[in-house]
Regions:
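Alpha-helical "hinge/linker" immediately C-terminal to small N-terminal DNA-binding modules
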Residues: 3-34
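Hydrophobic residues within well-ordered alpha-helices
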Residues: 5-8, 42, 83-84, 133, ...
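Short beta-strand and adjacent tight-turn residues that come in two discontinuous sequence segments
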Residues: 21, 74, 88-94, 172, ...
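Central regulatory/effector-binding core of bacterial HTH transcription factors
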Residues: 35-100
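A local structural motif
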Residues: 63-71, 159-168
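Alpha-to-beta junction loops
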Residues: 67, 79, 84-93, 112, ...
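Beta-alpha-beta core module
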Residues: 99-106, 110, 125, 132, ...
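Secondary-structure junction motif
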Residues: 122, 138-159
Length: 215
């Protein structure tokens, strides 16, 4: 085996420090010259991660090839908590941030719509009010979801208690919601972007809320 002398160990220790400082210097110089590099931890809610981020991350990677992006997927509440705890660099969520000390910016506006199976009683409606939805089976997102937070607030705003809805189950992803709704068990409320493929195939029907629900 090979072992270092005390002098060799001292030289190795300083060499490691020099290399570490060199890496840090590269990063700092890159920041000063506007060149981004290094790891980037991005947190995103389920809907955003599955249906909106893939194209954006591809474009980002092409613009900043020196940045190694890593995506963490969870519901909006969990992502917000991770940003507050500094375990991720940036979070993309569907509802306004609630914790103080966090800086938030609106990236885009999204419309939420009712979806149901083509043979479900709601399917032929041109639009539907929050009050009318009390008469139908509801497939909901789970607590902590940005979509759940927004829809609960929407119902309350229009004098419908979320607890009064005929909630059949609470599910943790848009894909799970679409799968259950397509069987005719009830309706769900999801981002318009989530159901493009199913609408084209005729597997689901999309109905605007009245008044519209945007976020």
């Amino acid at each position: 085996s090979i072992s270092l002398t005390p002098a060799g160990e001292l030289v190795l220790s300083y060499a490691e420090k020099i290399l570490s400082l060199s890496d840090e210097l590269d990063i700092r110089l890159s920041e000063m010259t506007g060149e981004m590099r290094g790891p980037l931890l991005v947190g995103a809610s389920t809907t955003i991660a599955e249906f909106m981020l893939p194209k954006v991350l591809g474009e980002f990677n092409a613009m900043y090839p020196q940045v190694r992006a890593r995506l963490i997927v969870a519901n909006s509440e969990s992502i917000e908590n991770r940003v507050a705890e500094h375990t991720i660099d940036v979070g993309l969520i569907e509802a306004p941030a609630k914790q103080s000390g966090l800086s938030s910016h609106i990236c885009c506006e999204d419309e939420l719509r009712v979806i149901c199976a083509p043979d479900y009683p709601l399917a032929d409606m041109k639009s539907v009010t929050p009050k009318a939805l009390e008469d139908y089976e509801f497939i909901s997102r789970e607590p902590g979801s940005g979509t759940r937070e927004i829809t609960d607030a929407y119902f309350r705003q229009h004098h419908v208690a979320p607890e009064s809805l005929k909630t059949q189950m609470e599910l943790g992803s848009p894909e799970a919601l679409k799968g259950v709704v397509s069987t005719g068990l009830g309706f769900a409320i999801v981002s318009r972007a989530v159901v493009d493929k199913e609408l084209q195939l005729g597997d689901l029907v999309s109905i605007p809320l009245k008044p519209p629900l945007t976020r």
